[in-house]
Amino acid sequence: MEMLIKNAVVVSPADKLNEKTDILIKDGVIAEIGNGITSDGEIIDADGLCAVPGFVDMHVHLRDPGQTHKEDIITGCRAAAAGGVTSLLAMPNTNPTTDSPEIVKYILDKAKDADSRVYVAASVTKGLKSEEPTDIDAVKSAGAIALTDDGRPVENTKYLSDAMKKAPKLGMTIVAHCEDLFLADGGKINEGEVSEKLGVKGIPAGAEDCGTAREIALAAALNEPIHICHVSTKTSVALIRDAKRRGVKVTAETAPHYVSLTDRELLRGDADYRMNPPLRTQADVDEIINGLCDGTLDAVATDHAPHTPEEKADFVKAPNGSIGMETSFAVCNTYLVKTGRMTLSQLVEKMSVNPARILKINAGTLSVGANADVVLINPDEEWTVDVNKLHGKSKNTPFKGRTLTGKVKKTILGGKIVFSD
């Protein structure tokens, strides 16, 4: 099977490409990139569009198994495709927890028919309880590529340390949710002016910062790598920046909502703006953007966390989390590229190249022989987020009703069109 993409501006920083050219796809892989290519296969005229390597979202909650009323593997990957996400890392806070070979295999088997490539993160500890370590060899053999207790920190530092020493030998990535639960103390939103005004218990920024400091200290002491999730505070950015200067093997991600929204959104009393870590202050947002631009923060990942409208109905009692895969590119393009803080090529590094490198997966490139995971985007098209037109089961997006710039027009997975706008 052949497919020829004509006249696209190919933006692939891993391949040092940023030019108008053609892409020939054969049998699911990139066969040729150049001008004047001809083919008897399907022709896509991409004049006016950019072609980028499929986005890699390294932080996704698919809710499958156990919470499939919120999302499942098939619907989650449908949402991924609509957002240009062709590879994703599924978090282990499922029910049962992804802490056994059986659950890893269940996810991978179900994902074979999905519209995105699904990679699995198993838990560091059984049931995310920090009471007993997961059998890392067993989950690795079943196909897991990463380890995390995301949704909560690994409270037992010895178990985290042991996992950090073992994971590199198996080619696995340790992904750390940084939070001091004693400091967080059941808070619901960022501690500060807004929480005081609403009379809602806050989570101090220090809860995240203490967790970040612990993980960096471990990585430094062990001389082993660690990846830090969903960075939301200016102090965590400073800690990571300093650690990188000292040669600590730390990488980090933030999420689209942390570069675009502040805790003032919570004044609406809408739980779709509640996530963990919570939305912070404008000073935090500014420093998150600085961290992305100067390389302190390596990646953008959504922390896609679906919940039903019923679950999100009560502002204080609602679970944390928001969906994000369908809006991720548009939000980052709007708030980072269109504001002049970074180029489209630099954004592709954060959304494709670096996540693939951190996870050690075959993605983030359009080089000859690579998987033909290609996204056609119009970086200048404006659109308004309509929750009724989203592709997943849940609608809890903090960007509902917002007009964004940058639209995914087609998503190609292994040479097959899985989404078309």
Model-predicted segments: where are they?
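His/Asp/Glu-enriched, well-ordered alpha-helical/loop segment
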Residues: 197-225, 272, 294, 298-300, ...
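A glycine-rich helix N-cap at a beta->alpha junction
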Residues: 109-124
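Active-site metal-binding motif and surrounding structural segment of the metallo-beta-lactamase
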Residues: 36-51
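Histidine/acidic residue-rich metal-binding segments in metalloenzymes
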Residues: 105, 133-300
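C-terminal cap of metal-dependent C-N hydrolases
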Residues: 314, 371-421
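Metal-associated gating/positioning segment near the N- to mid-region
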Residues: 49-111
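N-terminal metal-binding scaffold of metallo-dependent hydrolase/deaminase domains
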Residues: 1-38
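Divalent metal-coordination and catalytic microenvironments
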Residues: 8, 23, 28, 48, ...
